[in-house]
From Swiss-Prot:
Biological process annotations from GO: polyprenol biosynthetic process
Stored HAMAP family: ISPT
Family, as annotated: Belongs to the UPP synthase family.
High-level lineage: Bacteria, Pseudomonadati, Pseudomonadota, Betaproteobacteria, Burkholderiales
Binding sites annotated in the UniProt record for substrate: 25-29, 37, 41, 69-71, 73, 75, 190, 196-198
Role noted for this protein: Catalyzes the condensation of isopentenyl diphosphate (IPP) with allylic pyrophosphates generating different type of terpenoids.
Cofactors: Mg(2+)
GO CC terms in record: cytosol
Annotated source species: Ralstonia nicotianae (strain ATCC BAA-1114 / GMI1000) (Ralstonia solanacearum)
Name listed for the protein in its UniProt record: Isoprenyl transferase
Gene encoding the protein: uppS
Residues the entry annotates as binding Mg(2+): D24, E209
Length: 258
């Protein structure tokens, strides 16, 4: 299990171990080109392929993509229907490619809201790539940060119905979070110009570096990822410490690997 950044100082590197992305701007990309919004979503799938490949080639261990939030059900029915079809198309076409590249696919969120067919396709995709040792790509679908915390609390109490309130700690709750298998994101990226986290990974983003770009998701490519990584390398990641404590020769802080 990965240690919480609020309990210990995690190991860091020039390349982020875990990158989380809100893929925003598909609709606006299409509108500015006088195209239907669906065209933006289709083009966005190309950007997903590029992001996965770029992350894999740069040594990222975990890439988490916010594909569909629990609030996205409020969108027009036609758009939701198209997104579901696009999701199934992506699962059919991309899983074998991911598997051939040694990439593992995981999907997190309240999957009960999806059709039985989509749920089956998700299970099959996860099973097919389960033993792959490379990059883990997580698709957050019908996911919300508040949902994640609530479902973790419910699962904890279901497993330990007699647990005392004082025993409900970060260490106790963390194994029940949807992304318990991954380290906390080092770098959060949001495309499309908005500057908010939109109920995404509220628990896990506690000490993530937040990078916002005006570029719409369909235009996101390896060069834009490199710009985000260059910005990340210039960040001073203190995790509650002072800058002076980061100077060479100072006493080492507790490490997650200690």
């Amino acid at each position: 299990m990965h240690i919480s950044s609020t309990l210990a100082v995690p190991d860091t590197a020039d390349t982020p171990h875990h990158v989380a992305i809100i893929m925003d701007g598909n609709g606006r990309w299409a509108t500015e080109r006088h195209l239907p919004r669906m065209a933006g979503h289709s083009r966005g799938l190309d950007a997903v392929r590029a992001a996965v490949q770029a992350a894999d080639h740069r040594g990222v261990r975990y890439l988490t993509l916010f594909a569909f939030s629990s609030e996205n059900w409020r969108r027009p029915a036609e758009e939701i229907s198209f997104l579901m079809k696009l999701f199934m198309t992506a699962l059919r076409r991309e899983v074998s490619k991911l598997n051939d590249s040694g990439i593992r696919l995981r999907v997190v969120g309240d999957l009960s809201a999806f059709s039985p067919r989509i749920q089956l396709m998700i299970r099959e995709a996860e099973a097919k790539t389960a033993t792959n040792p490379g990059l883990t790509v997580t698709i957050a679908a019908n996911y919300g940060g508040r949902w994640d915390i609530l479902q973790a609390m419910r699962a904890l109490v279901a497993d330990q119905p007699d647990i005392a309130p004082e025993a409900i700690t970060e260490e106790a709750l963390s194994p029940y979070m949807a992304l318990a298998y991954a380290s906390e994101p080092d770098l959060f990226i949001r495309t499309g110009g908005e500057q908010r986290i939109s109920n995404f990974m509220l628990w896990q983003l506690a000490y993530s570096e937040l990078y916002f770009t005006e570029r719409y998701w369909p235009d996101f490519d390896a060069a834009e990822m490199d710009r985000a990584f260059a910005w990340y390398r210039n960040r001073e990641r203190r995790f509650g410490r002072t800058s002076a404590q980061l100077e060479p020769g100072t006493a080492p802080a507790l490490s997650a690997g200690a």
